Amino acid sequence: MSSSSGPLSPQSTTATSSLAAKAANPLSSKVTTVLSSSYADTEFREALALLDERGVQNTAETRRQLRLDLQKEVIDSNGEIIDEFAKVAEQLRRIGTTIGRLNETFNEMKTQIGSAQKTTSSTLIEASQLMIQRRQVEQKQALLGAFNTNFVLSEDETAALTLTSEPVDDLFFAVLAKAKRISKDCEILLGFENQTLGLEIMEQTSKNLNLGFQKLYKWVQREFKTLNLENPQIGSSIRHALRVLAERPSLFQNCLDFLAEAREHVLSNSFHTALTGSSPSGIEDQSVKPIELVAHDTLRYVGDMLAWAHSAAVGEREALEGLFIGEGDEIAKGIQAGRDNEIWRLVAEDGEVSDTFDAVETLNELVDRDLSGAARLLRQRVEQVIQTNEETILAYKLANLLNFYKSTFSRLLSVGSALVETLGALESEALRQFRSLARDHVAAIQGDFQHTPADLRPPEFLLGALEQLAAIMKTYETSFTSSSDREEEFEPVLAEAFDPFISGSANMAKPLRAPSNSIFLINCLLTAERSLSRFDFTQRRAARLQAQIQEERARLVETQYRFFRGESGLDSLIVQLEPLGESKEDIQKALLLESLQSPALSQASQKLDDFLPSALMDAMENLKNLQDSRLVQSITEEAAEKFCVDFEHVEEMLILVDEATEQKQNEQDDIQGPRTLFPRTSGEIRVLLS
């Protein structure tokens, strides 16, 4: 026992530990394996899930048989797979047999195709060549079709373009446009080395184009014969035709000439009907009130004729605008294109540049030509009226009326139009008649220029002339004039209707004595100035008359001044004292003057006293025939003021002389001073003359 319970030797201890470790290794290995297994491992989790699906119970029997069961299932599965692969192998054998038969069939077909290729190779080559030839033929056919389409007119198109039996419609204009395009495109063909084709096509196309334009030209002429410009709905075809025809400027101009002739005839007949109420053939128009019915009223008669011409011109212009301008500047472009295509226009001679077509100017010229026939008839009638008129004012009113319509037509047509020139000539003739009648009137009253009215009032011929001039000026004032200087324009009228009469009045005043000559002339000038000053276009002439009035007024002031000096008895005293001043030498000279001696000075004082009470009335009586009372008063007051100024100088000299006399009175008591003999003062004089 003791031996067994004693300490173990190292050898025995080591052996025991080794056995214990061997016994414990399988378990620890399993535990270690289990512990080291990761439940996150996919295969492990799938295995566990599979066990759950089988419903395996965790029993000792199950744990012993689990491995065997699993191996048995694997073996069974492998057997099933082998059976399936056997079926696949059988099918592969069948496929191999089928492929073998296909290879045999393919080889047979290959042999047959090879033999067929040998027999058909020549045919294929020929077919390929035929296909190439077919494509070439198709290309040529397409080229020929395109060529015919772009460079050749079909028979139907040629007939529509050239035959006059075919209408001028949209087809005609389409073919014409195509022909023009062909002609232009032929320039491309002429760029090739062989120009024969291009020349032939261009020659034929040009021929067809010329025939087409001739057909269009004749058609337009036929349309113009029946064209009614009064109809606001003018056909669009005629406008289109004119735009196209404009490419042939010569034909277009011929059409304009034809239209102008036709419209001239129509408007001439219309004007004749408006004048007489019947056509030139004698057919009466009941709807028209003849203008000739008012022939007795000269101004209205001429005005109605001019108004008709203006209305006709406006209507003609509006209608023709629809033909030539209503479609923009197509006509201008057509004419310019036609001019550019004319050979003689291609090179300008001497640098000459062809004028650009102006549609408005052409329209104005056409309207002017349309009215030329009516204008001739209008001129005949108006000339007859002017020549038979014997009234000066009416002659001027006619000239003014003609001037108004001349300005109106200048804006409507142009300054250089024949109608405006006709009206200008008629206006000049009316003015010549006016001047002639005015001069005849002056010549007829030459005898009246010799008889001045006793009361110095303006003569009757001047009053009549001013009344006539007033009527003329009212007419001119209401008239339309383009002149920037109306006064300058009206001067010729004043030269004929005013100057002879005012000059005659001035000549009548020359033989008269003062102040009658100035009074008469002022009366005439005042009357004339009042007439002229009412109008703005005679202000310069009125100012000249006012200047003449002031000249004559100055003469009357001087006359009245001389009257005051003479009638007051102070003239000699004023004359003698005027050059003297306040110096002692002048005072000594004054003492020796005879007019300052007692008798003469007393007499002058007495005469002054007698004159002063009625001086102003007597002075104004001198101007009683002057028709402007305010002017009489102003003239007299100015003359009195001059007299008072002179008297102040006299008074100053008398005071100085009186002072010198007082010194002598101390020596000689019998000497009287001038102020004693002449006590009047300048203040008293001003009061009495105011």
From Swiss-Prot:
InterPro entries named among the record's database cross-references: COG6, COG6_C, COG6_N
GO BP, sorted A to Z: intra-Golgi vesicle-mediated transport; protein transport
Positions of the UniProt region annotated as Disordered: 1-22
Membrane topology: Peripheral membrane protein
Entry GO CC: Golgi membrane; Golgi transport complex
Protein location: Golgi apparatus membrane
Pfam family, one: COG6_C
Family that this chain belongs to: Belongs to the COG6 family.
Function as written in the Swiss-Prot or TrEMBL entry: Acts as a component of the peripheral membrane COG complex that is involved in intra-Golgi protein trafficking. COG is located at the cis-Golgi, and regulates tethering of retrograde intra-Golgi vesicles and possibly a number of other membrane trafficking events.
Protein name: Conserved oligomeric Golgi complex subunit 6
